[in-house]
């Protein structure tokens, strides 16, 4: 008989340096790490504090329901941007809130009036993904965005530092980069939480199969 603890364990541990981030509070929980994925197999085997579920299609309620049910932790769900905006975005966001998401995420191209409507109608945080500390980001924050998610590639730490200097209390999520050093720089710049992209499922499966083939070969030699 299998011990439950041995079955449900984290095969994908987020980088330890992320634990040094101060964290953001969502649904009464302190969140320092978010796994950037919609893959349920990855999510269920990762020890991140929350899930950042954003994908390049219109948000589907069936996908949201599956993510919320399986994740067993707060889910920040993408609801709009350049593809989905206006009334459709608002309807999707309201439905996502009723399904139990901890927050909704829109990207930098979202119209200001949509941000205002989301802030007015939702009880969960409205997170805007930004690429720069510019006039667009400022208008979105003024319109009611309650958090920002900084995704600026190699300039992420720089953008985080600029935002932090202007908005001292604004919760900031940011991509951390591929190395512990890059993550540490982003946290030092003022990020409260880090979104972490796990290895591709194909890479993980390849490693498992290489181990399986090695063990099979050893059995033949025994």
Give the predicted meaning of each segment:
Residues 1-77, 81-88, 98:
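Conserved N-terminal beta1-alpha1 strand-loop-helix module at the mouth
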Residues 23, 70-82, 119-129, 165-175:
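Short beta-strand/loop segments at the ligand-binding rim of alpha/beta enzyme cores
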Residues 29-35, 50-57, 78-85, 101-111, ...:
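Catalytic beta/alpha-barrel core
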Residues 44-51, 74-75, 97-102, 120-123, ...:
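Short, surface-exposed connector motifs at secondary-structure boundaries
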Residues 59-98, 109-121, 133-139, 156-160:
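N-terminal active-site wall of soluble small-molecule enzyme domains
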Residues 87-96, 134-144, 178-196:
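Catalytic cores of alpha/beta
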Residues 99-111, 146-159, 189-211:
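Glycine-rich phosphate-binding active-site loops on the catalytic face of alpha/beta enzymes
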Residues 117-121, 162-163, 184-188, 199-222:
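C-terminal helical cap(s) of enzyme catalytic domains, especially alpha/beta-barrels
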């Amino acid at each position: 008989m299998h011990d439950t603890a041995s079955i449900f364990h984290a095969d994908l541990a987020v980088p330890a340096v992320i634990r040094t981030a101060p964290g953001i509070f969502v649904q009464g929980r302190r969140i320092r790490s978010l796994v950037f994925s919609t893959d349920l197999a990855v999510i269920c085997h990762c020890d991140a504090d929350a899930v950042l579920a954003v994908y390049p299609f219109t948000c589907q309620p069936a996908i949201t329901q599956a993510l919320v049910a399986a994740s067993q932790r707060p889910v920040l769900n993408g609801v709009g941007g350049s593809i989905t905006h206006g009334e459709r975005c608002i309807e999707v966001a309201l439905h996502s809130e009723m399904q139990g998401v901890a927050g909704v995420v829109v990207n930098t191209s979202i119209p200001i009036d949509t941000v205002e409507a989301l802030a007015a109608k939702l009880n969960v945080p409205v997170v805007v993904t930004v690429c720069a500390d510019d006039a667009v980001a400022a208008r979105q924050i003024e319109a009611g965005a309650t958090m920002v998610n900084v995704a600026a590639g190699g300039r992420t730490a720089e953008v985080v530092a600029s935002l932090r200097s202007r908005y001292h209390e604004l919760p900031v999520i940011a991509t951390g980069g591929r190395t512990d050093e890059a993550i540490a720089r982003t946290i030092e710049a003022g990020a409260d939480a880090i979104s972490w992209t796990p290895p591709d499922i194909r890479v993980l499966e390849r490693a498992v199969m290489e181990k399986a083939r090695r063990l099979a070969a050893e059995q033949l030699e025994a």
